[in-house]
């Protein structure tokens, strides 16, 4: 471990294997708090490299509680959080709509980072249990098309880093790991990041981790596809990464203001999402969710974003998507 420390403190990049060794030790509680703080700040100051991020993610995945991985195509839609936008839970709403149109979504989530309520806070407000066993969650994925995997249940080693992260009060590598350590290991993912500077590093990391197809997005300060600003995309497809930009017109939609997407407490967000999934949501909410679902559909090979948006809008306005929420709550 001293060799790894010395490389870090000299400003040198770690290999994937070295990063994996380091983070395996971290999540086993083998570093002191001062050592961990020094490691995280050293990496932050020079910038974390994709090989280092991938090594950390592999350490978390290798030590995660197991999930029975399906042999059918499935995906995740998730953001890093930390964008400060305090928006409604767009990725969570998008997961329900995606399931309604036939996609399989194993959504990895945690408590709030950037909004007043994260995906897990919102699910709890709906009465959806967060403590499902891996086998029960897999059954929900099979039968309802959607399951939620609560990060602390699968990644208990995070607890060793929590005190230092709270004391540092700054973003570190741990802030970008969440979307990369889904224990179901989906082959497809739509991942939002809090800074455009993370687009290529995270796309490169997804390539190293072996994702089949994925899109990393940022839009005007938000960690998702948004309609208030152009969405910057780094798309991974069969080992190649392409950068491009999307605007509302690419989805056949009109722009909205960022203030139109503001959320609130878990209970407020629960009501906003319930209205949306019953086909009675605000235009900005409905269309923002539809745009995210449209890009997720593209990752499944349905390339026409405007047609995809129409499919998603039809599912939302049918009012039937709320049945997915009720079905998950009933299985508590």
Swiss-Prot record:
It catalyses: N-(5-phospho-beta-D-ribosyl)anthranilate + diphosphate = 5-phospho-alpha-D-ribose 1-diphosphate + anthranilate. Its EC number is 2.4.2.18. The keyword Nucleotide-binding does not apply. Mg(2+) 1 binds at residues 91, 224. GO terms for molecular function: anthranilate phosphoribosyltransferase activity; magnesium ion binding. Mg(2+) 2 binds at residues 223-224. It comes from the Bacteria. Anthranilate 1 binds at residues 79, 110. GO terms for cellular component: cytosol. Anthranilate 2 binds at residue 165. 5-phospho-alpha-D-ribose 1-diphosphate binds at residues 79, 82-83, 87, 89-92, 107-115, 119. SUPFAM superfamilies: Nucleoside phosphorylase/phosphoribosyltransferase catalytic domain (SSF52418), Nucleoside phosphorylase/phosphoribosyltransferase N-terminal domain (SSF47648). Keywords: Amino-acid biosynthesis, Aromatic amino acid biosynthesis, Glycosyltransferase, Magnesium, Metal-binding, Transferase, Tryptophan biosynthesis. Pathway: Amino-acid biosynthesis; L-tryptophan biosynthesis; L-tryptophan from chorismate: step 2/5. One of its GO terms (biological process) is L-tryptophan biosynthetic process. Catalyzes the transfer of the phosphoribosyl group of 5-phosphorylribose-1-pyrophosphate (PRPP) to anthranilate to yield N-(5'-phosphoribosyl)-anthranilate (PRA). Belongs to the anthranilate phosphoribosyltransferase family. Homodimer. This is Anthranilate phosphoribosyltransferase. The lineage of its organism: Bacteria, Pseudomonadati, Pseudomonadota, Gammaproteobacteria, Enterobacterales.
């Amino acid at each position: 471990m001293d060799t790894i420390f010395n490389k870090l403190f000299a400003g040198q990049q770690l290999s994937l294997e070295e990063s994996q060794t380091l983070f395996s030790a971290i999540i086993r509680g083998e570093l002191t708090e001062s050592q961990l703080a020094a490691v995280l700040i050293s990496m932050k100051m020079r910038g974390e490299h994709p090989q280092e991020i991938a090594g950390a993610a592999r350490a978390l995945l290798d030590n995660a509680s197991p999930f029975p991985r399906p042999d059918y195509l499935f995906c995740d839609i998730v953001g890093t959080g930390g964008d400060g936008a305090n928006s409604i839970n767009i990725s969570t709403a998008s997961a329900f709509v995606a399931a309604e149109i036939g996609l399989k979504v194993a959504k990895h989530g945690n408590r709030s980072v950037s909004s007043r309520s994260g995906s897990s806070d919102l699910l709890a407000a709906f009465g959806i249990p967060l403590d499902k066993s891996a086998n029960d969650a897999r059954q929900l994925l099979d039968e309802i098309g959607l399951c939620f995997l609560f990060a602390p249940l699968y990644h208990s080693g995070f607890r060793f880093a929590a005190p230092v992260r709270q004391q540092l009060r700054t973003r570190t590598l741990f802030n970008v790991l969440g979307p990369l350590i889904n224990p179901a290991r989906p082959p497809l993912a739509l991942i939002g990041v809090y800074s455009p500077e993370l687009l290529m590093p995270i796309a490169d990391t997804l390539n190293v981790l072996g994702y089949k197809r994925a899109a990393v997005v940022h839009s005007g300060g938000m960690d998702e596809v948004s309609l208030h600003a152009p969405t910057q995309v780094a798309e991974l497809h069969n080992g190649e990464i392409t950068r491009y930009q999307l605007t509302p017109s690419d989805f056949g939609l009109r722009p909205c203001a960022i203030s139109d997407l503001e959320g609130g407490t878990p209970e407020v967000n629960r009501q906003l999402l319930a209205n949306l999934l019953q086909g009675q949501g605000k235009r900005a909410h409905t269309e923002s969710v539809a745009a995210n679902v449209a890009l997720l559909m593209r990752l499944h090979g349905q390339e026409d974003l405007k047609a995809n948006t129409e499919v998603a809008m039809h599912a939302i306005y049918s009012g039937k998507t709320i049945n997915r929420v009720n079905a998950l709550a009933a299985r508590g």
